[in-house]
């Protein structure tokens, strides 16, 4: 496969940003073996924003000949008070429910889960020289910068936090260098940590990325954060700047079940959630149902997406590009309920293998349910 095709695979939907395409091209031209990683906190049920968005990109990286790795961030989850802050519970869920759920998500998005390396963070964090890398990074970043970076944990700047949470950004940066990762992948909300990694890359003494005797910066690939299905906290949204301000509150959230579809939801749960979704007629800028259609259904174009309607409402209609769908919705030619029903049906079919897996292997999901009940 030529270099341009590899760059196209890395850059396509749901990717929103590559830091930088030129750097990626340089690494490919140098012939440097590429190692990807994406890290996850272990916090609750896997929703589509985690499973399908990450799974789609992992599939793309594999097609581009890049080694892929999922980093199960148990210590990071402990620091960030996930699953009651109980490290043993976090580790059980990580190696049971979460690992299996991600494998199935990768599979339905066209990737090969057997070619993904799964690493539990504590396997490397408990080595002494990992912490030397943390100190090396920390000596090259100001306290103010670390304070601003706590948003990667879903925390607000100025929020009262314990001291352990200040170590978190340096740990996330260290994870990249300590594992020899040259493609750091995450959602857009993790951008600050990756920018720090790129800024300190050429200053590090311990575990820098080196190729042909030269220190190199890791590439950062950030995928789109799916909008939650709920109505935004303010409506209407007046312009792009206001949207940026409230975007964090609009993303899918495990703590708001009706904002998210989980990978093992039943067909009826999926349909019910989509029926209740915020989807104003004619609104194409801040519309979660259209957002899901764009980044899940129309990830690859052309495709065929058929919306079934009674003849009196125009009959069935098939779209091959997102722009066609968006135009008809904007012009009122497509009713919100028809769009919701069609997206729901698509997801029901897409997620069928995941549901079937958990029906045949119920133990991981039962463990997760028991943890949720006792939290």
Swiss-Prot record:
GO terms for molecular function: ATP binding; tyrosine-tRNA ligase activity. L-tyrosine binds at residues 37, 168, 172, 175, 190. A motif ('KMSKS' region) lies at residues 251-255. NCBIfam families: PRK08560.1. It is found in: Cytoplasm. Transmembrane segments: none annotated. Its EC number is 6.1.1.1. Keywords: Aminoacyl-tRNA synthetase, ATP-binding, Cytoplasm, Ligase, Nucleotide-binding, Protein biosynthesis. It comes from the Archaea. Catalyzes the attachment of tyrosine to tRNA(Tyr) in a two-step reaction: tyrosine is first activated by ATP to form Tyr-AMP and then transferred to the acceptor end of tRNA(Tyr). ATP binds at residue 254. Homodimer. Belongs to the class-I aminoacyl-tRNA synthetase family. TyrS type 4 subfamily. This is Tyrosine--tRNA ligase. The keyword Nucleotide-binding applies. PANTHER family: TYROSINE--TRNA LIGASE, CYTOPLASMIC, TYROSINE-TRNA LIGASE. One of its GO terms (biological process) is tyrosyl-tRNA aminoacylation. The keyword Protein biosynthesis applies. GO terms for cellular component: cytoplasm. It catalyses: tRNA(Tyr) + L-tyrosine + ATP = L-tyrosyl-tRNA(Tyr) + AMP + diphosphate + H(+). Pfam families: tRNA-synt_1b.
